[in-house]
Amino acid sequence: MDSIDTELAARIRRDIIFGTIKNSERVSEAQLCESYNVSRTPVRLALRLLEREGLVKRGEGRGYHVQSPSIQDIKQAVLVLGHLESLAARLMAQQPKQNESISILKNQIDEIDHLLSTLTFDDASLQLIQQHNAVFHKTIMENCGNNFVNFTCNQISHLPMLEVGLMVFDKSVLSTEEGVERSIFRLKLGNSQHKVICEAIEKGDSVRSEGMMREHLNILVEYIELFEKSDEKLTLSNLITYSGIELSTFEPTKKEASN
């Protein structure tokens, strides 16, 4: 169970991302205590965490100024994530034989293949694919032999589309037969890349594993750019609806949304 300050930081972070707390808005400990009905200690600790994440900046006196990330910030962070995951794949390929970890990777590939063969594109199926995809990517991250790679990824994982192993869907196209076929093709292509990455790691081919992982993750930037072209007023909250993130992680409560 998360501590009170961690839970509070998540609530404030969500409100910043959804714009309930506006960019450049000044917030104080007293104000947040009242808004979230908590004492000063968890507020102070939550603000320190959010400051490290770059979502708030300490101003003059005791106040903070909100620094809501932009779409460009997300694109830049996705590029960083791509380099880190590519590095993790290369480093894992250089590690001594990891039969158990390789077995986990292969199991995720097989499970995704099975789901794609019977896919109906309902929420339950997509969620299962998302889970197996996350296990695949996190297994590489956690077994690369360099804890700082995983640590650095965790520092940006609070942002939309920045969770390791997150999948991206344009749900607007899933209402058409052509859109479903195109999405299935993309998922099959992604899992075929998983197979190449896994085989390269198993063979100790660090160059191949790194290159394929980078190609595999380039799709995230391409999708953000595609969403920007289709929506000139693209916001972070819009971006979340395109990702595999469970909206309950970010979505304001009904009471908050009505304010």
Question: Which residues fall in each region the model found?
Answer:
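Residue-level marker of regulatory loop/turn positions in helix-turn-helix DNA-binding domains and
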Residues: 1, 25, 66, 129, ...
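Short linear motifs at protein or domain termini
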Residues: 1-95, 229-232, 243-259
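Short, flexible helix-adjacent loops and helix caps
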Residues: 17-21, 89, 93-97, 117-121, ...
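A ubiquitous short alpha-helical element
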Residues: 71-75, 93-98, 120-124, 176-185
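Short, solvent-exposed amphipathic helices
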Residues: 80-83, 132, 223-226
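Conserved amphipathic alpha-helical segments that form helical-bundle/coiled-coil interaction surfaces
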Residues: 99-171, 190-200, 206-220
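C-terminal all-alpha effector/ligand-binding and dimerization domain
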Residues: 166-259
